[in-house]
């Protein structure tokens, strides 16, 4: 595995972690909070984004405008049943969700959740490193690399990992700062 391939794989892993971070509430309303909500619509689980337009008219409100008004009740039910703890307000045409300010206790819970997502991201990055190093060792064993070349490749793989871990730590720090900001 070349360093560029490894970096591309690690970049994808980092982006997945960032998407997880985006689903964690901060003090502001954000339509990405609803990314993981699936609505049972005509017997099939459908992502909310496929059924409605999501917008944030102000910092404390998320507005959901369904493409098909008949799905309004199903969307409302899915949001109410989600783990987000939001109470949707249905006016017959749109659903509005008031995002209340976070309590200190809730902020700490979300920081723990962000740390958990970051740790999962680190594990994914380490797994990619392990796979890359295993390939290098196999190439050394097959005679494609000398021992010195193998060690150099392993060092470069480790440097790539270190770079991405630092980036992930920065993302975590930014997310925690956003969560704790009152």
UniProtKB/Swiss-Prot annotation:
Its taxonomic placement starts with: Bacteria, Bacillati, Cyanobacteriota, Cyanophyceae, Synechococcales
Q: Which GO terms describe its cellular component?
A: cytoplasm
Where is it localised?
Answer: Cytoplasm
Which keywords annotate this record? Cytoplasm, Protein biosynthesis
Q: Which family does it belong to?
A: Belongs to the RRF family.
UniProt cross-references to Gene3D superfamilies, sorted A to Z: 3.30.1360.40, Ribosome-recycling factor
Organism domain of life: Bacteria
From the UniProt entry, list the residue stretches annotated as the region Disordered: 136-156
What's this protein's function?
A: Responsible for the release of ribosomes from messenger RNA at the termination of protein biosynthesis. May increase the efficiency of translation by recycling ribosomes from one round of translation to another.
An annotated GO BP:
translational termination
InterPro entries on file: Ribosome_recyc_fac, Ribosome_recyc_fac_dom, RRF_sf
What's the short name of a Pfam family annotated to this entry? Answer: RRF
Q: Which GO-annotated molecular functions does the record name? A: ribosomal large subunit binding
UniProt entry tagged with the keyword Cytoplasm: yes
Protein's name according to its UniProt entry: Ribosome-recycling factor
């Amino acid at each position: 595995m070349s360093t560029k391939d490894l970096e591309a794989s690690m970049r994808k892993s980092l982006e997945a972690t960032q998407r997880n971070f985006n689903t964690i509430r901060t003090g502001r309303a954000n339509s990405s909070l609803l990314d993981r909500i699936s609505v049972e619509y005509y017997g099939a689980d459908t992502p909310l984004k496929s059924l409605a337009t999501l917008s944030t008219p102000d910092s404390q409100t998320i507005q959901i405008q369904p493409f098909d008004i008949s799905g309004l009740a199903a969307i409302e039910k899915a949001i109410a049943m989600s783990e987000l703890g939001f109470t949707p307000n249905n006016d017959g045409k749109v659903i509005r969700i008031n995002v209340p300010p976070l309590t200190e206790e809730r902020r700490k819970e979300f920081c723990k959740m962000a740390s958990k997502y970051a740790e999962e991201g680190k594990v994914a990055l380490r797994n990619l490193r392990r796979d890359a190093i295993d390939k290098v060792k196999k190439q050394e064993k097959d005679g494609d690399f000398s021992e010195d070349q193998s060690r150099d490749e392993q060092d470069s793989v480790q440097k790539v990992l270190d770079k991405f871990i630092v980036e992930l730590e920065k993302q975590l720090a930014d997310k925690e700062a956003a969560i704790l900001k009152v």
